[in-house]
Amino acid sequence: MSPSQVDEALEAMRGLFPETPLQLNEHLSARYGANVYLKREDLTPVRSYKIRGAFNFFRKIVGDSPSGTTFVCASAGNHAQGFAYVCRHFGVQGVV
């Protein structure tokens, strides 16, 4: 992806959930003698970064898919949760 495509994807994603913060972890910082920041992906709606990939896939494909298309996901974990959430966001049928 080009930098402009990354910026476009980030902007589109803000309609689904806010930017996840970087948070200084004082315990780990003290332990390792360096500032250690945690990227708080647990603050996304499905508690995982996997929603990002599902969102970008659907953002690209939904408009080109025939009406009534059912999407299928073979996962039982974080990706499945992101897939289901994004299906609902885009108003498409999904099967996990």
Locate predicted features.
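PLP-dependent amino-acid enzyme catalytic core
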Residues: 1-96
